[in-house]
Amino acid sequence: MATQKSVDELKKAHALLAELDYEKRPVERGYANRTLYINLSDNTIETKPVTEQMKTLFTGGRGFGLWLLYQAIDDETKWNDPQNEIVIANGPICGIVSYPGSGKSTVVTVSPLTKSIIDSNAGGYFAPYLKFSGFDALEIQGKAEEDVIIVIDGDEGKVTVETAPLEDLDSHLIGPQLTEMYAIDERDKRGVSVVST
């Protein structure tokens, strides 16, 4: 676990590459009604609306992930092309504690192994926190020139892309580092979720 001094050093080494302030709004009938798009090649961040067509035909989760990926790629897109996306999406019952498994997110991308579109799911807190932050899906496209982190602060209504030059590269180490870095205090650590590749 990182010490407070080392966390301060890590944060001090960050440079802000992109920032988006957004209006927080409530989830309606299971939908936040927008997605978050981040392009790491040109450091752009924007929100996109969730249309009635998306909700009717694709519901959420895997459907949203596939829809968003299909809109971004073409038949020639390879797994390591900047055009490929990693899409993390949640469904309309995500975050409802009455249903087991409602904390799942679906990840959709072009696979390096099969060279075809794949989806996988993961549990944890990220999907509900993404929903409660105001987004039904997160699209990450492009290739960063250096190691970066994406911070979605649902309490403040802010998304940032920051350089991360000193952080550990191993997922089991960077998770606790980032939790320590972005939690306000010990109690707030429960409100931080880290996804890493």
Label every model-predicted segment.
Residues 1-197:
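N-terminal export/ancillary region detector
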